[in-house]
């Protein structure tokens, strides 16, 4: 059977997108097949797979799978890419609302290759000894470093992800360097089990964490934080109302790479 697909990338975070608007040839049970599609030597190659599906109450539903073939938590760059995909298919307008695993999301297509994604509010941020831990749709461990170029993201990230605290469920691990108002980030992603060129929920987590510095508590104001990942530049906009982070937007590129068919 031939399965049509389209490949998208958001700042180098790449995804296989399957239009399941009318039929569902692939399902959540196809774990091994989905993992094989993500394999960069024996498949198409990607950080994850997404199904675009109809939904009765939203413009569409996003179903996301990690590169290991298992259904994953929210993927920020994936969310931006699937919005671009649906827009290019003519299924949605520039302003849209869709459903993901962590709940509803708003999004807007600013231009054909730039999408802004509304993220869930964040109320709980753990401040540990040299790290922050928070959930921006996916769990993220964030630690600040003086020189990101000296960090072995894979080795150090894997040690934290498989450490005693996170061994059972795992976590994404982010190493963040501040450079004035901007951030540079390296992320080890759970489910991919490797460093990725960008991680949208990790970039969001890093931007929120940056508002704690240097005073130790965010100010009641609007923020716009530029973040540079290995795969490109993004921006996170948000506000702090004294109790939680609100009006969070992950803004960045979402670009079609190619379309094709693969036999399964």
Predicted features along the sequence, with ranges:
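A glycine-rich beta-to-alpha transition motif near the start of alpha/beta enzyme domains, typified by
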Residues: 1-111, 142-264
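Active-site glycine-rich loop that binds ribose-phosphate moieties when present
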Residues: 117-131, 155-160
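Short glycine/Trp-rich loop-beta-loop segment that forms part of the substrate-binding cleft
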Residues: 134
